[in-house]
Amino acid sequence: MYVMPSVKRIQKKSPLHGMSCCVITFLVLIVIVWVYGWNVVDDNHTTPQAQHSFIQRRPYDANKCAVSSISDLSDDELRPKAGRRHMVTPPQGGKLALVCCETTKGNMNLLIHQKWAPIGVARFLEMVESNYFETRVPLFRCTDACQFGLAGDPEFTKRFNTRLQDDPMWLPPGIDHRQNERGVKRFPQGYYTYAGGGNDSRNNQFVLTLKPNQFMGGGSPWEVPMGELVGNESFDTIAKIYTGYGEKGPSQGLLRREGNSIKVKTDWPLLDYITSCGVVDETELPE
């Protein structure tokens, strides 16, 4: 906290004394705002964990991915409904963010739906805009689904390690809803959600389904989907991700401590990584 230096009282003040004090006070306020930034919350602006602005974002080359604009997406991708891919109709409308991610096996697009999981979406987009994935995030646990999120730089992992409140689950729970009468499984290929270990346990780790999965989301509110892959390139990319290490990739403890250390690169040389992510387009759809 800035503390003004004390000034001895004098008997006769200069005519400019009052003006000088005002100027000094103004300069101090400018410095405080420059260092700490505005932190104003009112009825229309909520904290990052509650709502993403969908306005300010860092520059990112939209041409890195095959889908560079939301206008390139089909209506089925923008407004998915129950059918051959989705077991149930997801929440409709609201704000959408198109994210492009580069990986060591190619690029992929994620369409993030704020209405699917508003709290989780806000955290993920905050991580994207903080250059989190530019630290080379390892895809360290990949079988039929791929778990990742621990940063290549442990300081980034620590920064986003705080837990989030669960969003409401909109998929049907229980063993009776692992798949429907048409054989559509609860989690189709390319659904994107958080990894967790209990209620309100989401923080900085995610799961992307490489194949349709009937078990996820069955009674785990932290696994509510927040988006899905879109575009043919994305599905071509995840088909190439190395899954040979399975459950025997680097431990979470090792990655938390060391990130992409020499040991990780040496002991798991075939591990794939996400090397960057950025928001390339955004829009809002009516319900």
Each language-model region and where it sits:
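Cyclophilin-like peptidyl-prolyl cis-trans isomerases
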Residues: 2-287
